[in-house]
Regions:
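Charge-dense, helix-prone N-terminal extensions
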Residues: 1-120
Length: 120
């Protein structure tokens, strides 16, 4: 039986929250799922929030995703060169999308917590 499609940001969040050490939070004032133990966001609304969501992942993986499934995985100029890729809702391969959300969580969980920002 194949996985149901991820048709909305809420579907992506619901799946991400089934992963270990995750919590619903915000990033840049918008909803996001973070790794609890280090406070880093790995899934977020992104700038194309009506048609996609974003995940944090390494640059090499992003290039492979864009080459092998450009209908699902893409970057706008805002994200190019950064470890972030956008994922269109209702992908033809929802299992791969879930796998990438899991990999994003694992990749982000391996990072140290961000340094505190100075308040102005």
């Amino acid at each position: 039986m194949s996985a149901p499609p991820i048709g909305s940001f809420e579907d992506a969040v619901a799946f991400a929250l089934t992963l270990p050490d995750t919590e619903l939070s915000t990033s840049y004032g918008k909803p996001a799922v973070k790794v609890k133990s280090n406070g880093r966001a790995f899934l977020y609304t992104g700038h194309e929030h009506h048609s996609s969501f974003g995940i944090a992942i390494d640059l090499d993986t992003i290039e492979i995703l864009k080459e092998t499934d450009p209908d699902t995985f893409f970057q706008t100029p805002h994200y190019e060169g950064w470890p972030a890729v956008l994922i269109r809702f209702d992908s033809a391969d929802p299992e791969r999308v879930r796998e990438m959300i899991e990999r994003s969580r694992d990749w982000t969980a391996a990072m140290k917590p961000p340094k505190a920002r100075k308040r102005k």
